[in-house]
Amino acid sequence: MDKSKLFLKSKRSFRRRLPPIGSGDRIDYRNMSLISRFISEQGKILSRRVNRLTLKQQRLITIAIKQARILSSLPFLNNEKQFERTESTPRTTGPRTRKK
């Protein structure tokens, strides 16, 4: 058996991921369907590593998101969970005592 062939790895084919922004997509503050893909649940801008964008695309996305926020077509924060009504303990109507 030839020793040089023992250490060669078989070449596995892999499927290249499609870029999140196509060539026809315009990065614009009015394109809400595109912008919303790059925002987290809390309304934060996702990082470039998570988005798999180039540096130029990430910069353009960030500028578009900030413009949309300023023009109030996008909220700065998305904290609906913060204001949800939860089960609270009933308040007592007895006399109050001061702590000394």
Swiss-Prot record:
Keywords: Chloroplast, Plastid, Ribonucleoprotein, Ribosomal protein, RNA-binding, rRNA-binding. Disulfide bonds: none annotated. Residues 89-100 have a biased composition (Low complexity). The keyword Methyltransferase does not apply. Residues 81-100 are annotated as: Disordered. One of its GO terms (biological process) is translation. GO terms for cellular component: chloroplast; mitochondrial small ribosomal subunit. The keyword Lipid metabolism does not apply. It comes from the Eukaryota. It is found in: Plastid, Chloroplast. Pfam families: Ribosomal_S18. Its main location: plastid. InterPro entries: Ribosomal_bS18, Ribosomal_bS18_CS, Ribosomal_bS18_sf. Part of the 30S ribosomal subunit. PANTHER family: 30S RIBOSOMAL PROTEIN S18, SMALL RIBOSOMAL SUBUNIT PROTEIN BS18M. Belongs to the bacterial ribosomal protein bS18 family. This is Small ribosomal subunit protein bS18c. The lineage of its organism: Eukaryota, Viridiplantae, Streptophyta, Embryophyta, Tracheophyta. The gene is rps18.
